[in-house]
């Protein structure tokens, strides 16, 4: 019934790939591309609290919608709201399977006071196996993880195991 403690994977990726060798191969082959994509996303200064960053908010939304469409989601679109754009996408072809809704936000908080930063907030980098940059932990990292997980499933299985609706807001 479960995995014994001495055989328990120490990392989520290890747990997933132990069950699916094709997924493990895909994740290994795309590791560098996934990291570069993540860093590219983090470079967008999508600060929602600053009206002068409205163009960056829009650019982040369009970047996400383009990624969703590229990896196989249908109806990937940016919808205007009175405040900030919402990105919506879906894939609804897992007949009989549940529908899962994934929500994240792609905006970040202002960086002021900038003089307290020891690194440039929108020039992300990897240090000691960790990605450092504004939004890496809240919430661009989680959002990007959802994109890459779906991409890996589309690439290795040609489909998702559930119906999936995506809602990302700025």
Where in this protein do the model-derived segments appear?
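General helical structural elements
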Residues: 11-12, 38, 138, 152
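Active-site metal-coordination/substrate-binding segment of hydrolases
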Residues: 97-168
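Short loop/turn motifs enriched for small/polar and acidic residues
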Residues: 81, 167-170
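General helical secondary-structure elements
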Residues: 3-4, 30, 39, 130
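N-terminal helical capping/dimerization or prosegment-like subdomains
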Residues: 17-114
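N-terminal low-complexity, intrinsically disordered patches enriched in charged
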Residues: 8-11, 54, 116, 142-144
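Short, Lys/Arg-enriched N-terminal segments with co-localized hydrophobic residues
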Residues: 2-15
């Amino acid at each position: 019934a479960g995995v014994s403690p001495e055989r328990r994977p120490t990392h989520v990726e290890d747990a997933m790939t132990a069950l699916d060798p094709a997924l493990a191969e895909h994740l290994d082959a795309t590791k560098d591309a996934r990291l570069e994509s993540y860093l590219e996303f983090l470079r967008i200064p999508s600060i929602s609290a600053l009206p002068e960053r409205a163009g960056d908010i829009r650019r982040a939304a369009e970047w996400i919608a383009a990624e969703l469409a590229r990896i196989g989601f249908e109806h990937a679109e940016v919808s205007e709201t009175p405040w900030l754009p919402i990105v919506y996408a879906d894939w609804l072809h897992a007949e009989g399977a549940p529908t899962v809704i994934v929500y994240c936000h792609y905006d970040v908080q202002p960086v002021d006071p900038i003089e307290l930063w020891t690194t440039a907030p929108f020039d992300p980098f990897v240090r000691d196996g960790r990605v450092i940059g504004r939004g890496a932990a809240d919430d661009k990292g989680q959002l990007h993880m959802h994109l890459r997980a779906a991409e890996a499933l589309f690439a290795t299985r040609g489909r998702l195991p559930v119906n999936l609706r995506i809602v990302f807001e700025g």
